[in-house]
Amino acid sequence: MVSTTLSVSRMTFVWRAARPSLLNHSLRKMSYQEGKPEPAKQALKKSKLPLGRFDSLEDSPEEREPLQKFPDDVNPVTKEKGGPKGPEPTRYGDWERKGRCIDF
């Protein structure tokens, strides 16, 4: 029991004695590397998957203002004032717009 305690205290002493030299070594290494130019970073690889329907850019002009506004806010086909601005929403594929689902 006494020898185990003695060996543990010696290891602790050795570690504490070695710690400042490790710190100094790492600081010297960092200061030495500051003078060297950093290697050029490689660009991240792009995925090899094809672009899908939902992978389009969100900053495109179609996303900002997808449909033209009606003159005087009146639909020329239905003569409805303030109604929906786009095509018939019950067509297949038109139930979702910008991540929002239409619920009637």
Curated annotation (Swiss-Prot):
Main location class: mitochondrion
GO MF assignments: enzyme activator activity
GO cellular component: a single term: mitochondrion
Pfam families per UniProt: DUF1674 (PF07896)
Annotated transit peptide: 1-30
Region (Disordered): 29-104
Keyword NAD: no
Alphabetized InterPro entries for the sequence: SDHF4
Keyword annotations of the record: Chaperone, Mitochondrion, Transit peptide
Gene Ontology terms describing biological process: cellular respiration; innate immune response; mitochondrial respiratory chain complex II assembly; positive regulation of succinate dehydrogenase activity
Comp. bias intervals (Basic and acidic residues): 63-83, 91-104
Compartment(s) where it occurs, according to its Swiss-Prot or TrEMBL record: Mitochondrion matrix
Keyword Transit peptide: yes
Physiological role: Plays an essential role in the assembly of succinate dehydrogenase (SDH), an enzyme complex (also referred to as respiratory complex II) that is a component of both the tricarboxylic acid (TCA) cycle and the mitochondrial electron transport chain, and which couples the oxidation of succinate to fumarate with the reduction of ubiquinone (coenzyme Q) to ubiquinol. Binds to the flavoprotein subunit Sdha in its FAD-bound form, blocking the generation of excess reactive oxygen species (ROS) and facilitating its assembly with the iron-sulfur protein subunit Sdhb into the SDH catalytic dimer.
Subunit-level organization: Interacts with Sdha in its FAD-bound form.
Family indicated by similarity: Belongs to the SDHAF4 family.
Protein name as annotated: Succinate dehydrogenase assembly factor 4, mitochondrial
Gene designation: Sdhaf4
